[in-house]
Amino acid sequence: MKQIHVIDSHTGGEPTRLVMKGFPQLHGRSMAEQRDELRELHDRWRRACLLEPRGNDVLVGALYCPPVSADATCGVIFFNNAGYLNMCGHGTIGLVASLQHLGLIAPGVHKIDTPVGQVSATLHEDGAITVANVPSYRYRQHVAVNVPGHGVVHGDIAWGGNWFFLVAEHGQRIELDNREVLTEYTWAMLKALEAQGITGENGAPIDHVELFADDPNADSRNFVMCPGKAYDRSPCGTGTSAKLACLAADGTLAEGQTWVQASITGSQFHGRYERDGERIRPFITGRAHMTADSTLLIDEQDPFAWGI
């Protein structure tokens, strides 16, 4: 019987399953190499951890790893029901909160190695967590995509740790009771982007769509479609970073000014940025709450031992 020790949390409603031990040892010299090794040689562990019958489509996984940098607290690899993520803002907040829950870290600044570079996270005395994300930028502005059944939609392409297509004018009602319509609309948009060869820089696939609307209690409300056809319950850390990059490029948000980003569930992240050459360094603040400390069991006689 194989065992996987996990800590479950949620950040603004979006769950993170942190794997503390039980996965195969990885040997890559960088987190990107270790992610590729996990994907190519040990992907069944991701499936066992996140897919039914132990998981669900909404879960985001985070594998706790030894750091590859001398000054880092740890390394991390993020994954979901469909595959692997470059970076995850809500997951980083969940990671830090979980490590505090386990007594492994104290308030202060903690550097974390990820497949797309090192980020830092500040655990504040009151439990809030601020992630200094990877340098972010807008790649293209006002890009047209023809979405079957919906016509031409325009959006910006931006990097915030993942590639996003950000749409402000869409004619959709961003409310929780409209989530099924929003899911089908944004999924059709993702498929249209792929079919029409619209990508991030150097041909990188765009795997997130972010819609925006007004919110009476925040600067904006969003709906974020993630790879795997699950919507983000949180305001999305990498998505908020991509939004900050667009606001900075438009000159509509000053350096250091706070942007309050609400999600479709009503949870909020507070974001700001600093200039970093031609890019920006986003700072995303939120909170995570623990939901479980448990052991997943894998019985290899189980026909669904490695997921459905």
Curated annotation (Swiss-Prot):
Which parts of the sequence bind substrate?
G89, H90, H208, D232, G237, T238
What range does the record give for the signal peptide?
none
Per the record, the domain of life is Bacteria
> Coiled-coil ranges per the record?
none
Q: Which reaction does it catalyse?
A: trans-4-hydroxy-L-proline = cis-4-hydroxy-D-proline
**First-level EC class:** isomerase
The reply to whether Cytoplasm figures as a keyword in the UniProt entry is no
Per UniProt, the keywords (alphabetical) are: Isomerase
GO: which molecular function terms? 4-hydroxyproline epimerase activity
Q: Where is the active site?
A: C88 (proton acceptor), C236 (proton donor)
EC number(s): the record gives 5.1.1.8
Keyword Isomerase among UniProt keywords = yes
Check the record and name the Pfam families matching this protein. Pro_racemase (PF05544)
Family, according to the entry, reads as follows: Belongs to the proline racemase family.
- What function does the entry list? Catalyzes the epimerization of trans-4-hydroxy-L-proline (t4LHyp) to cis-4-hydroxy-D-proline (c4DHyp). Is likely involved in a degradation pathway that converts t4LHyp to alpha-ketoglutarate. Can also catalyze the epimerization of trans-3-hydroxy-L-proline (t3LHyp) to cis-3-hydroxy-D-proline (c3DHyp), albeit with 200-fold lower efficiency.
Q: What is the name listed in the Swiss-Prot or TrEMBL entry for this protein?
A: 4-hydroxyproline 2-epimerase
Q: In which organism is this protein found?
A: Pseudomonas putida (strain ATCC 700007 / DSM 6899 / JCM 31910 / BCRC 17059 / LMG 24140 / F1)
